[in-house]
């Protein structure tokens, strides 16, 4: 199963994304097993057709095998799939912090609904504003800061055209549409800064509305909240 772990995928930095990565590897392993089995089965059928062509033989065992094998494969896919759906449902039941994300042409606005007065706009930094080590076209003037090991509910919407709030390293992509509030919950087990971009073509400056999400310790998050509201 680990043969395909992380194959062609980014390293995932959240629990749910890690489970999805494992499920992808598990399915790839199953598909490889199915490919080998079907190849051997067809080889056996072709061989037996020519070898026993003068005899009348009923392939009852082969028919039974072709009925049981797909059923087992489907059950092996169903169990982890339902487990992931159940886990995702539990994540959406409870949250410790709600962050409202609004897409504009061409920047993002963040509002912490549980912390009165904490809201700001996030614009891409120009080249002359970048500090050493900050990525070009991805760094912003105000990052969205959240605490780690905390269940966060994100509410995504738009103030104008359709946008998409996407962070590939977290397996997050949700459309931001005017008049519609899309929600999802996430928990981040590790600290760090994660970058993304609007992945819906939204106008001339579509390529210049990046996303910067900073995950930090709870004490640092509290200090950041007080400092931002001053």
From Swiss-Prot:
Residue positions binding Cu cation A1: 163, 198, 202, 209
GO biological process, alphabetically ordered: ATP synthesis coupled electron transport
Alphabetized CDD domains for the sequence: CcO_II_C (cd13912)
GO cellular component: mitochondrial inner membrane
The keyword Transport appears for this protein: yes
Names of the cofactor(s): Cu cation
Keywords assigned by UniProt, alphabetized: Copper, Electron transport, Magnesium, Membrane, Metal-binding, Mitochondrion, Mitochondrion inner membrane, Respiratory chain, Translocase, Transmembrane, Transmembrane helix, Transport
Reaction(s) this enzyme catalyzes, per UniProt: 4 Fe(II)-[cytochrome c] + O2 + 8 H(+)(in) = 4 Fe(III)-[cytochrome c] + 2 H2O + 4 H(+)(out)
Binding residues annotated for Mg(2+), in chain numbering: 200
Protein purpose: Component of the cytochrome c oxidase, the last enzyme in the mitochondrial electron transport chain which drives oxidative phosphorylation. The respiratory chain contains 3 multisubunit complexes succinate dehydrogenase (complex II, CII), ubiquinol-cytochrome c oxidoreductase (cytochrome b-c1 complex, complex III, CIII) and cytochrome c oxidase (complex IV, CIV), that cooperate to transfer electrons derived from NADH and succinate to molecular oxygen, creating an electrochemical gradient over the inner membrane that drives transmembrane transport and the ATP synthase.
This protein's name: Cytochrome c oxidase subunit 2
